[in-house]
Amino acid sequence: MTKNSSTVFTHARIATLEEKAANLGLIEEAALVVKDARIVYAGPENKLPDEYASFEKIDCGNRLITPGLIDCHTHLVHAGNRAHEFELRLQGATYEEVARAGGGIVSSVRNLRAASEDDLVRETLPRLDALIAEGVTTVEVKSGYGLDRDSEIKSLKAARRLGEERDVAIRTTFLGAHALPPEMNGDKAAYIDRVINDMLPAIAEQGLADAVDGFCEGIAFLPDEIARVFDAAKAHDIPVKLHADQLSNLHGAALAASYGALSADHLEYTDADGAAAMASAGTVAVLLPGAYYFIRETQKPPVEAFRAAGTKMALATDNNPGTSPLTSLLLTMNMGATLFRMTVEECIAGVTREAARALGILDQTGTLEIGKDADLAIWDIERPAELVYRIGFNPLWKRVFKGQI
């Protein structure tokens, strides 16, 4: 298929993921038409308009078409790994002991600062390729391991380059308020000053951030410190999102909602009031079962409270070197179901429609509706539940990005 090709996918089953449709919007004996990288028809094959008769045809053999998958929370750009720390923790070392030995996020900061932009792109591409191989068409990538202006800019530029190296959409997020760098000697107020007066203006001027994020936690930054960052982001007209309530309830979910955040992420310790605030604000709950699993957390996010409040839920890998070295959205869906008791429908919507909502791009992608980008994943499966049920098996038949296979 060429960039401006016109193609009909025939003999398919289609899960449109439309907002109000039941059963994932599943249409049997369906066809989907792509023209100029957009979806122009998705519906019963026997109602296919005659105007598409001359288009190139691809027989899907009764396979299932879903929207291309979206990984809406990653720290994909990083240098090195922390496998040695993993071994130390298995031997009983605490996080504090690892940090005192020069590990933890400090080691990731040290590695990233030492790497060139080219190094970062080269090291990140295999992780990105692993996601693409599972039908992922959009990936969010955060900075946050540089923690100074030049290194944060380097990270975001490397992330943007990933979208030039591969057929994938990249959404970049500035996460300067991720941790306190060692050179600040514990002075969080002075560091937040740097984030809002030095880093953010330079990043905004270069148009490098689609969103601004922060880590609201006792080991990172408190709500009043995050609020300063969010006020600055709003002044630059950049939407916000937040790592919230992962290790304790600092009411980060409610803070995110008060700023109309695109999403609040992690949320293991969020309470019912936080869930309700998010629902009212339209803030998506991005759940990250990979991190929950990897750090052996026991407090589950309040899925029932999110359901009761009507809070939208997404799933993501949270790929990062310290707490979730995960590059599989398929496994993430299984974890969402088995660990968090999410339904099949919630899991699949969580890596398509709701993931798009969490990035503020639901008008472009995330469902198979007329006018949206032709980002598709075609699966050799009999029923949608297989995407969530299987572990370590990839049933992807074809991946289509903006109309191109």
UniProtKB/Swiss-Prot annotation:
Keywords: Cytoplasm, Histidine metabolism, Hydrolase, Iron, Metal-binding, Zinc
EC annotation from Swiss-Prot or TrEMBL: 3.5.2.7
GO molecular function, a single term: zinc ion binding
GO BP annotations listed: L-histidine catabolic process to glutamate and formamide; L-histidine catabolic process to glutamate and formate
Chemical reaction(s) catalysed: 4-imidazolone-5-propanoate + H2O = N-formimidoyl-L-glutamate
Pathway in which the depicted protein is active: Amino-acid degradation; L-histidine degradation into L-glutamate; N-formimidoyl-L-glutamate from L-histidine: step 3/3
One GO term describing the cellular component: cytoplasm
Main location: cytoplasm
Membrane-crossing residue ranges in chain numbering: none
Family annotation (InterPro entries): Amidohydro-rel, HutI, Metal-dep_hydrolase_composite, Metal_Hydrolase
Subcellular location: Cytoplasm
Matches recorded under SUPFAM superfamilies: Composite domain of metallo-dependent hydrolases, Metallo-dependent hydrolases
Residues where Zn(2+) binds: H73, H75, H243, D318
Enzyme category, top tier: hydrolase
Residues the record lists as binding Fe(3+): H73, H75, H243, D318
Binding site for N-formimidoyl-L-glutamate: Y145, N320, G322
Co-factor note (free text): Binds 1 zinc or iron ion per subunit.
Cofactor(s) needed for function: Zn(2+); Fe(3+)
Binding site for 4-imidazolone-5-propanoate: R82, Y145, H178, Q246, T323
Entry similarity comment: Belongs to the metallo-dependent hydrolases superfamily. HutI family.
Function recorded in the entry: Catalyzes the hydrolytic cleavage of the carbon-nitrogen bond in imidazolone-5-propanoate to yield N-formimidoyl-L-glutamate. It is the third step in the universal histidine degradation pathway.
Stored NCBIfam families: hutI
Name this polypeptide is given: Imidazolonepropionase
